[in-house]
């Protein structure tokens, strides 16, 4: 089932006003500064998040007020925090990405840090996902461009997936592989718009995220888009103890790993 993904200008306020019941808002000061004040004012509580450490997330789950919905407005950290709280509480979830630097708004599993390492937990569906282009376009252009990294990873992910399939360590699906390749080729065709951070590019990135997520659910694993480039990123963060802009780090990993693979690095 495709998610209820809504894309347009100035649509966030209407989407939140349609909710039946009350809500807890999870965000950060930066993203919330560009949002209609009526949205935080109507929330049962507004909760800031600054970490994906499991202990921090569990503390939020224990402390936030009871509500019918969790609404997340922000970047990848906010998306995963809101997903975690909604999953643990068993309540409905609304996600409104303020940036397209990472695919967290359309994925169902939840990224968290456990003992300093990125792991994935749970399964939750946001209904709806509200991609308000007015809000997203207000984010720094560099960060919106970074979103391409979580899609370019198809270049190296598919290569590694095929290697794994030949070694009988992962299931392969020709149709899903072909669909993933189409997503990648469309991304290259959109490169000028992505560089200019046009509305067309922002919508393309968020819809491509949703398409890829559907493919991963169908095949039952992340092989089509998560390979050595992602593991490079995880290793860098584990070794440095730092977080980086996810799309930029994965983009770097894709460039490096495609060179090692002999797999279209010049693109």
Predicted feature residues:
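ATP/NTP phosphate-donor binding region
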Residues: 1-69
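Short beta-strand/turn micro-motifs composed of small residues
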Residues: 26-27, 74, 131
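A glycine/threonine-rich phosphate-anchoring loop and its flanking beta-alpha core
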Residues: 88-185
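Gly/Ser-rich catalytic serine loop of serine hydrolases
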Residues: 72-78
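Short glycine-/acidic-enriched loop or helix-start segments at secondary-structure transitions
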Residues: 34-37, 81-83, 105-106, 140-141
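Active-site segments that bind and position negatively charged phosphate/pyrophosphate groups
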Residues: 175-267
